[in-house]
Amino acid sequence: MMQSQQIPTTFQRYETKYMLSPIMARKLRKSLPGHLQMDEYGLDTICSLYYDTPDHQLIRRSLEKPVYKEKLRLRSYGPAKETSPIYVELKKKYEGIVYKRRERMILSEAVPYLAGKSEPGFDSQILHEITWFRNYYRGLAPAMYIAYDRIACFGTEDRNFRVTFDTNIRWRTDNLCPDGPTEGTRLLEPGWYLMEVKTPGAVPLWFSKILDDLAIYPASFSKYGFAYQIENQKESEEKEKAFIPFTDIRQTVSKTAFR
């Protein structure tokens, strides 16, 4: 078998999330010049297709906030096409540290691979891990599509210190095709940002001071988790509307039976 391309395939770092209102985002933006530099991709659209079991075992477990949790997704930078590169990514979190293991494939190779219908034309340790995950969780299938616009930055003094700003986050549970449109239901109000701070170690003191001065605090937030809760609540409400209590049925029968 040919070997996988030599690209970054593993990440191990701390990731902290912050929810920024439009006002907070404007104030923070004024404090960052000279400290952060936008990376070579600038503003990009990130598209992720999350896989889960039929009973949503992975996201339900994740929402319970266990010590260890994991997710599987297909990720593309920009709208995916049949022959465009895409990442098959296994994301794990253990005691606050995020581990990402991913392999690059083309879309037409990745989708049948995750469906268990074929194997890619290369071999690697990471691929073995993803394959084990795919086989362990029976019935894995696309569960939710999430896209958002991201501004990615890195520290001018330390390129390993990264900060991303995600906005226009949208999601859907229909048309779960990686190469489909990037439209969906908005997850946040217009102007809001999800900021993620990613670092292999401690956050720089200058950044901590800026957050303290602006009263910006960490937030527990998962795009897939939050969207799943919204979808789950919507389904519950629809079921309640469709359910007619027995007392209502009895009253209806008593009023119409002898007409």
Summary of predicted features, one role per range:
Residues 1-259:
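Phosphate-end processing signature that detects enzymes handling 5′-triphosphorylated RNA
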